């Protein structure tokens, strides 16, 4: 590591790096996604914002899908290492491992909706991040700590899996033959975790509502410049209601009717 040459860089270090929001600098810098959001003084009345105070943190709101690729030389080449998938903003998202030889992915990874979708893995963890970052006084670091506890368990499980498949490194045919099993296990784990995420999302939303705060992920996922469509007017136009003041120059029917009298 940068501070200790005898310490190896771990997965947890990589996750922490991508979540970093200058917490270790004791207020020297503030993530620039907090401009106009977070006051730096007691009540904000005496704030003097330095020009260099706001910086772009690795855990910025715009850092999305910042995955971690783990190259393991002990695994068969066909496995392609391990991808620790971090969907959504890196600051408050869980990292979940997947081998590179999967034949299919879980259904929650497949929606491509542009706004919040409750059936989407991305939009679910995005919503959790939004609740965390917009209610720091209520949740603090609890959400990030929740993910860290999950990741600790996933790392343990992944080491067991790696050891099992490392035995196939010298036999590419055998490694190829287990791809269906690897895919099956990944789908089952994804389904289990997604159900947990949805439950956690629901619990956090309930906490906000109990605190009297609003939570509308559908509205929050719309573009910042989105404007609600105006209702179509049912009032008649001015042209329709304006009385005519011009005298008609067309002859009346009586004037144009030919005379039959002798």
Identify the residue ranges that each predicted region occupies.
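Long, intrinsically disordered low-complexity tandem-repeat segments
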Residues: 230-261
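C-terminus-biased signal that marks the final domain/tail of proteins
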Residues: 1-231
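Accessible peptide chain termini
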Residues: 1, 261-262
């Amino acid at each position: 590591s940068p501070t200790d040459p005898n310490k190896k860089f771990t997965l947890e270090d990589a996750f922490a790096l991508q979540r970093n929001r200058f917490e270790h600098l004791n207020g020297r810098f503030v993530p620039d996604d907090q401009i106009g959001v977070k006051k730096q003084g007691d009540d904000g009345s005496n704030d003097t914002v330095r020009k260099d105070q706001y910086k772009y943190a690795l855990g910025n709101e715009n850092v999305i899908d910042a995955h971690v690729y783990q190259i393991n030389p002990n695994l068969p080449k066909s496995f392609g290492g391990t991808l620790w998938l971090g969907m959504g903003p890196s600051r408050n998202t869980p990292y979940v491992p997947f081998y590179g030889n999967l034949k299919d992915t879980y259904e929650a990874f497949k929606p491509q909706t542009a706004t919040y979708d409750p059936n989407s893995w991305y939009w679910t963890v995005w919503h959790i991040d939004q609740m965390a970052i917009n209610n720091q006084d209520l949740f603090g670091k609890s959400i990030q700590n929740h993910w860290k506890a999950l990741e600790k368990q996933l790392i343990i499980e992944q080491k067991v899996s790696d050891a099992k498949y490392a035995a196939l490194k010298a036999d590419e045919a055998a490694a190829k033959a287990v791809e269906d099993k690897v895919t099956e296990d990944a789908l089952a784990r994804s389904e289990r975790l997604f159900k947990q995420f949805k439950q956690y999302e629901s619990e956090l939303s309930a906490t906000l509502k109990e605190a009297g705060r609003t939570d509308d992920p559908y509205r929050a996922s719309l573009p910042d410049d989105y404007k609600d469509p105006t209702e179509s007017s049912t009032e008649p136009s001015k042209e329709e209601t304006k009385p005519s003041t011009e005298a008609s120059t067309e002859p009346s029917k009586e004037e144009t009717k030919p005379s039959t009298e002798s």
